[in-house]
């Protein structure tokens, strides 16, 4: 569940311009494969034009999310990752 979102700085590009990311605070319900500790935040680009993902915030919609962890353990998601609302999955 995505609880909240905010725009954060993620360093600078090669020209010194700040790189923005959307930081989603999430409530992890279950981990199928990944680190032992709960994921608290997921990062994505700020627009779908640069492969950013938009999640419903407020904690009502549950998602199955497959993303990538960077070297610092931060979880990142893009449009190419598997991200579907939980209630659309079949058994």
From Swiss-Prot:
GO molecular function annotation: metalloendopeptidase inhibitor activity
Recorded GO CC terms: extracellular matrix; extracellular space
Main location: secreted
Matches recorded under PANTHER family: METALLOPROTEASE INHIBITOR, METALLOPROTEINASE INHIBITOR 2
Protein name per Swiss-Prot or TrEMBL: Metalloproteinase inhibitor 2
Posttranslational mods: The activity of TIMP2 is dependent on the presence of disulfide bonds.
Keywords: Disulfide bond, Metalloenzyme inhibitor, Metalloprotease inhibitor, Protease inhibitor, Secreted
Function: Complexes with metalloproteinases (such as collagenases) and irreversibly inactivates them.
Localization (cell): Secreted
Superkingdom of the organism of origin: Eukaryota
Family: Belongs to the protease inhibitor I35 (TIMP) family.
Start and end residues of each NTR domain: 1-91
GO biological process entries: negative regulation of membrane protein ectodomain proteolysis; response to cytokine; response to hormone
Bilayer-spanning residue ranges: none
Disulfide bond entries: none
